[in-house]
From Swiss-Prot:
The gene is obg. An essential GTPase which binds GTP, GDP and possibly (p)ppGpp with moderate affinity, with high nucleotide exchange rates and a fairly low GTP hydrolysis rate. Plays a role in control of the cell cycle, stress response, ribosome biogenesis and in those bacteria that undergo differentiation, in morphogenesis control. The lineage of its organism: Bacteria, Pseudomonadati, Pseudomonadota, Alphaproteobacteria, Rhodobacterales. GTP binds at residues 166-173, 191-195, 212-215, 279-282, 308-310. This is GTPase Obg. It is found in: Cytoplasm. It comes from the Bacteria.
Length: 348
């Protein structure tokens, strides 16, 4: 299935049905009075996060979603039928943006979560509603309320515990395939990975989800290479695993390139916890390892882990470091939720 993480959608809720002007007509009843029914409500447009979807590709082939109008009222106090609503089924992790692509209308992060995008119009009143002591035979009825028409954007941000970062050919896909059941495309050329991949990684009888995104290059925030739009898929991650190619002659510059792109992207991505690892050490001798590690640690300003996805050397240490950061993040979230509950005043 093709991957699509951004889609433009046109939606319109249904208009309400018109009220009816009608009078009771029965034998031997000379003054039957009004009996016009109300119009039905127009259908609303909803979005719902569902399980089993991981792409917005369906919205490439259908961009217009129009709910049904409510039917008009009828005589004998019969109300019109309500219009059928429409539900947009989206993957978990979908953000719904206004037409400006900046204003976030909703963020669906749980299965079954729903949000109302466009409310259907109310039905008009029939003439029965306008009967009074001074007007026993009203000949007026309300028109139905118009529906709401708008343009929205759907943007998918995959939900993972950890995200993989690095230049093209840093070994991210090989790492994911070595540590999980994911089978991303692997080849010895840049930009082998063209869309994000998810894998469930296990270590010490615990599991977490890791996302592999296409590699970044210098100037990605300006659209070079594949660009930086896939960085949105690691915004929700608790920790970022930054892989640096140990066979490169410029490991420090490679590391700085990715950090600069994170800072240019903005948001909280640059300040997220990071684990930095020097990859492909199976291709280096002891002297080359020490030299590359020293250069990278001087740039990072912190200890750097050594690993190889092929020989699996140091792999468990890297996974344990990532897992520790995930546990710390979950603990911080629980503490924040507990403090919010304490600050909430008691209500009877």
């Amino acid at each position: 299935m093709k991957f699509l993480d951004l889609a433009k959608v046109y939606i319109r809720s249904g208009a309400g049905g018109n009220g009816c002007v009608s009078f009771r007509r029965e034998k031997f009843i000379e003054y039957g009075g009004p009996d016009g029914g109300d119009g039905g409500k127009g259908g609303s447009v909803w979005a719902e996060a569902v399980d089993g979807l991981n792409t917005l590709i369906d919205f490439r082939y259908q961009q217009h979603f129009f709910a049904k109008n409510g039917q008009s009222g009828m005589g004998r106090q019969r109300s019109g039928k309500d219009g059928d609503e429409i539900v947009l089924r989206v993957p978990v992790g979908t953000e719904i943006l206004d037409e400006d692509e900046e204003t976030v209308l909703a963020d669906l992060t749980h299965v079954g979560e729903r949000v109302l995008l466009a409310k259907g119009g109310n039905g008009g009143f029939g003439n029965l509603h306008f009967k009074s002591s001074t007007n026993q035979a009203p000949r007026r009825a309300n028109s139905g309320q118009e529906g709401v028409e708008r343009t929205i954007w759907l943007r998918l941000k995959l939900i993972a515990d950890a995200g993989l970062l690095g230049l093209p050919n840093a070994g991210k896909s090989t790492f994911l395939s070595s540590t999980s059941n994911a089978r991303p495309k692997i080849a010895d050329y840049p930009f082998t990975t063209l869309h994000p991949n998810l894998g469930v990684v296990g270590i010490d009888n615990t599991e977490f989800v890791m996302a592999d995104i296409p590699g970044l290059i210098e100037g990605a925030h300006e659209g070079r290479g594949i660009g930086d739009r896939f960085l949105g898929h690691v915004e929700r991650c608790a920790v970022l695993l930054h892989l640096v190619d140990g066979t490169s002659e410029t490991v420090a510059e490679d590391y700085r390139t990715i950090i600069n792109e994170l800072e240019a992207y903005g948001g909280e991505l640059a300040s997220k916890p990071r684990v930095t690892a020097l990859n492909k050490i199976d291709a280096l001798d002891d002297e080359e390892r020490a030299e590359a590690r020293a250069a990278l640690e001087a740039e990072v300003g912190a200890p750097v882990l050594m690993m190889s996805s092929v020989s699996r050397e140091g792999l468990d240490l890297v996974l344990r470091a990532v897992r520790a950061e995930i546990d710390d993040d979950r603990l911080r979230i629980k503490q924040a939720e507990a403090s919010e509950e304490e600050d909430t005043p008691w209500q009877p």
